[in-house]
Amino acid sequence: AYAEALGVDIDSLILSQPNTGEEGLQIADTLISSGAIDIVVVDSVAALVPRAEIEGEMGDAHVGLQARLMSQALRKLSGTISKTKTIAIFINQIREKVGIMFGN
């Protein structure tokens, strides 16, 4: 309803909510490789949680997993993106102070 009011063609919109970061990036890769779409938006990079982190125990250290996941995915996607001319937008967020919200 809201997207439609903004002019989004709902019938052409593909929405996916994957369980893991790997799944999400694989979906993006498949869509981009198909050449059938013009734009892919990943919102948000911070929500792309690596499988190892989801399947691990609370408190386990997973240093750099997300950074490695994104680095590998972007290396893989960049070639495909240049061939298909698909636009890929990755949305992220910046956190300057842990525990501080709303500009305080």
Curated annotation (Swiss-Prot):
Gene Ontology BP, a term: SOS response
Coiled-coil ranges per UniProt: none
Molecular-function annotations in GO: ATP binding; ATP-dependent DNA damage sensor activity; single-stranded DNA binding
Pfam families the UniProt entry points to: RecA
Principal subcellular localization: cytoplasm
GO cellular component, one term: cytosol
InterPro entries: DNA_recomb/repair_RecA, P-loop_NTPase, RecA-like_N, RecA_ATP-bd
Keywords of this entry: ATP-binding, Cytoplasm, DNA damage, DNA recombination, DNA repair, DNA-binding, Nucleotide-binding, SOS response
Subcellular location, record wording: Cytoplasm
Keyword Cytoplasm: yes
TM segment ranges: none
UniProt family annotation: Belongs to the RecA family.
Function: Can catalyze the hydrolysis of ATP in the presence of single-stranded DNA, the ATP-dependent uptake of single-stranded DNA by duplex DNA, and the ATP-dependent hybridization of homologous single-stranded DNAs. It interacts with LexA causing its activation and leading to its autocatalytic cleavage.
Designated name of the protein: Protein RecA
